[in-house]
């Protein structure tokens, strides 16, 4: 196998990527123990994520879908860090380091992952700031910065802040009686520099402001305070603009967003007697696992950055300073906030096979003949209907299914949880 590199064929890109593997002649024996015959699993996944990011530059996709590809890259990288990177760090933490099939030790892999990930994430923000946002501006979709707010827009933002944000935000001053709070995995937070004394007479030079996940990260400005177009404001901009209202009587010297990614990998023993209980415990603890990555606004002062790194037990290798929002995944909301069907793919309505369009029992339909559903061309709802009926059917003893990456409002989970028969196993 060669170790040469080939140039990526994407127009305008001179990045080097691994060359295609040389296939040995037929009959030639392959040494399966040779490290050079294997790619590193984590670096290979990073390259896949990069291919997703490059879709954001593909002008054959509608503009909003290109932004979504940029967001999907962020979502993929989140999972990569909280599972893959976390797993390598766990090996080092507990002295269980093993050499991968590619010959890399965990520390070597982490160093190379950091180098490549920093490069990819820099390119992601470059694409966002210098390609996607300017193209959206041309399409009259504006991300309105604080310095660009008109007096009418600034007044609307103030009202929105006081009515929607202020009641649900809980600032946490840092002092000897108030240690650094436990922050939820991947939550948006702000570190605030302060001067003066708070309402209780305490000198608090620093505070943390967690932003509840219930708050939208993007808000659409109403048309009556804009001069046409689709105008969006970042939640971070609104909090920055009115941080002083969170700390009455104190001077806000700086406000900077940051986000911590934690270890979210599940560790279960092989000889578990109660899988469900073990999973419940692991799912609760994964919200507060060890830190694996710190994302910080690139204008955050160095002393605050170092303070955060020390607090989370991280190093410069784990630090990602970004020019823009620290969580681009939430920009997927743009598609639902703007009325521009010309800038996105049209919706697709999957069909339902004629045999199961009626309201009869899914079990009765299956008894007549096998039913094959081809997703996404055919609707998934018959599967959910089957699970709902099975959960209530007294003749069903157990429902066992593997679910991958379920959403917060999964219909399948709802169907399985809706059974009134506690004796039925749902695994």
Q: What is the meaning of each model-derived region?
A:
Residues 2-427:
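N-terminal localization/anchoring segments of enzymes in phospholipid and broader phosphate metabolism
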